[in-house]
């Protein structure tokens, strides 16, 4: 499941022509959201160096908890403590 950094996984989804970015979303830690988590479709994400961007919002990669395919399969998940 966890192969490489979350940025590498997202780059593969976004730039590999065999993948469809609309088939994936990320789950981030979000203090204001119900349950403390928020889903963001990968197609709305722009990748940066230490952060990714959703519109004007700059979000650090360490806030990503999971990358999930729309069929429910977890592609990448943060390490459990």
From Swiss-Prot:
Transmembrane segments: none annotated. InterPro entries: MJ1316, UPF0248. Disulfide bonds: none annotated. Belongs to the UPF0248 family. NCBIfam families: PRK04257.1. This is UPF0248 protein TK0315. It comes from Thermococcus kodakarensis (strain ATCC BAA-918 / JCM 12380 / KOD1).
